[in-house]
Amino acid sequence: MQERYQPNLVEAAAQQDWQARDAYLVHESAKNADGSEKPKFYACSMLPYPSGKLHMGHVRNYTINDMMARQLRMRGYNVLMPMGWDAFGMPAENAAIKSKVPPAKWTYDNIAYMKKQMKAMGLAIDWSREMCACDPAYYKWNQWLFLKMLEKGIAYRKTQVVNWDPVDQTVLANEQVIDGRGWRSGAPVEKREIPGYYLRITDYADELLDQVKNGLPGWPERVRVMQENWIGKSEGVRLAFPHDIKDENGQLIQDGKLFVFTTRADTVMGVTFCAVAPEHPLATLAARNNPALATFIEQCKLGGTTEAEIATREKEGIPTGLSVKHPLTGQAVDLWVGNYVLMSYGDGAVMGVPAHDERDFAFARKYGLTIRQVIAQEGKTYSDQAWQEWYGDKQTGRTINSGKYDGLSTAEAVDAIAADLNALGLGEKQTTYRLRDWGISRQRYWGTPIPIIHCQDCGPVPVPEQDLPVVLPDDLIPDGSGNPLAKNEAFLSCSCPACGKPARRETDTMDTFVDSSWYFMRYTSPGNDQAMVDKRNDYWMPMDQYIGGIEHAVLHLLYARFWTKVMRDLGMLKFDEPFTRLLCQGMVLNHIYSRRTPQGGIEYFWPEEVENIYDAKGAIVGARLKSDGSEITYGGVGTMSKSKNNGVDPQSLIDTLGADTARLFVMFASPPEQTLEWSDSGVDGANRFLRRLWALAYDRRAAVARGLASGYAWQDAPAPVKDLRRELYGLLKQAEYDYQRIQYNTVVSASMKMLNAIDNAQLPEGPAADAAIAEGLGLLLRVLYPVVPHVTWHIWRDLGYAAELGDLLDAPWPHVDEAALIADEIELMLQVNGKLRGAIRVAAQAAKEDIEKIAVAQEEVARFLEGRPPKRVIVVPGKLVNVVG
């Protein structure tokens, strides 16, 4: 064993050994030495986008996974930890435009570098199962399942309103529309209706909701609530406001009924206006002869269309000059166009009840509309001058100003009004969902081609199964002016599978969330070109532990659950939910430093470029540039980001201090599910600990060799040896518990205490001490191994443990020696008249009378009683003795 710890040599040696013997190659139905089958455990991190380099968030995520995999393997599990690449998507297209290389080359170059980084981290990944979303062998099955969904009616085609950039000739996501303009071209964005494919996730809404509420106990509560809210089940009434408004052809628009959905049918007698979305047919009709309305509608189209954007936007509207009829009274109700009404939600229309809806109240106050109270609460006075929370309460109020419905509770009024609407043919109770069908069509190049052929005679025709995959050309270079597939004749030109005539391929590609909705199952069935998954999937799935960021709580996790249920219904799976347990690791944070530029922008600085300014309490209050001493702004801590120059390059840290240092720091600095604040001093502390571990092993190598060979029996060990063993096994017991709770920071803390205990133990020389050191260091190495596998593997091998117990990768997890935890003596706090005055040591099984005698005989008792005899002695077993006098 070398005297000095050199992480580059230690880590290279360990990794070479692991690679040479395929240490992480996993097979189904692995056996124990006695022939019994090992229990399986599937632990998986959310697959990364190959952006170019790993960041510290990756390091944290994968180290959590790796610790779990290694410790469970020691406990006898057959553990699967795979890895793949979420390789399709816009960043590759944007990089291709900038660098003028095909997205495929950019993507595969990045994968090669990031894979090298992962191996440098020492991750226990079975690379034989690697998948890549842009590999035709993978996305073939996206296309295959899409066709199956099309057959079952789960996939269907309809028109959709999109953000269209007329300069770049492409569709933009809502997030790419900034102040009504394209994020790249700066051109005013247009709203266009184009056809696209959708998946009926709404058919699974009830099952998705029920299981996230009642069937996923291993998921964080906040994620379950987020999914519940996203699905957004609402029970209410869908009712119609009749009208006689006709289009230019004399046809009643939408057959003369304006439908709305409400969860507050009890307030229908308080309706004073209705509002429709800017895209609603009634709005379009009214705008033809109303220039102000037409202008307003165009302005609405420039904004984003997400619910989040609409929720924060100032609520504005304009009257159409049209009216509809109240379904129960027949009175005219003015019709408005509102910028807060979504065409994609419900029927694209809402009823306005200003008295009992805060948004409607503000809208009515702004435009001087009537506010009619129809719900009252005993002892409270209503005023239409300012909103009060009780106006919207539906638990305790009673109806007023509602004719025959007066005096009813909310539930009673809803039932009565729904019954009357139903009798009139103008409404019924209905359950709706916030969840919308999943639109998967993207007018992008770098994605899975949708396997559809367009024929002038036959229309859209599915690609025959035997012709899959429809292969994406991987040599195209986007130029920013639309989808390059639409200009590539070699891809476009084909024959219609139905009639054989010349036809054109679909140029839309699939949403990249399709790729990530089932990749974790492909890991279980690698190399199968005949089926999406096979019987090996039944062995590994459902996944035991999924690990990833909270930002994926809704879309990815919801789509993966939906995809699983579709595969189940197609007879491919035997389970309902893909992920038994979910851990959402916290973000990695670092300090942010910036200043305003003369042009009004913000310039960010790397932490190493500045010196902090501290207040009297040691808190950072500002910073100075090291280069010229000028003061800059300290912005606190925030998520590591390239744009804010506060990221830390894992590769630089690995190259200088080693992967084990990086792993140890990110595991020790914070519990896995909480945010982690970066600390250079914390990194240095982690490295010092590893050097101290190495030094201890080197210094005690001879004692370990003697101890391993001694076969010492512990019953006759001297007291200091027994004390050390008791402390170490107590720490082992705590560490084992913390491993099971995934509280890895306290596992590291226990390891540090174990090191201190061994290093500071005052043991008499001899066989007992040697055996205790050998045993203790062996315990420490096994507890630490999942955290820092390289250095522990090296020490384990060099000190001879491997020869005795086998390679550390498969060394058994140590059992707690319960006998070692039993103390011969215990320490009791000594009190005199209730005040702590010292401590005494007594035999663990000492009788109460013996404890009293030892306590009374102490010098401190005589001194504090000032010669008075004790009146009584109180013994609290195992804790204290109190002499009263």
UniProtKB/Swiss-Prot annotation:
InterPro entries in alphabetical order: aa-tRNA-synth_I_CS, aa-tRNA-synth_Ia, Leu-tRNA-ligase, Leu_tRNA-synth_edit, M/V/L/I-tRNA-synth_anticd-bd, Methionyl/Leucyl_tRNA_Synth, Rossmann-like_a/b/a_fold, tRNAsynth_Ia_anticodon-bd
Record's subcellular location: Cytoplasm
Enzyme class of the recorded protein, top EC level: ligase
Gene Ontology terms for molecular function: aminoacyl-tRNA deacylase activity; ATP binding; leucine-tRNA ligase activity
Short sequence motif 'KMSKS' region: positions: 639-643
Main location: cytoplasm
Superkingdom: Bacteria
HAMAP family noted in UniProt: Leu_tRNA_synth_B
Name the record gives this protein: Leucine--tRNA ligase
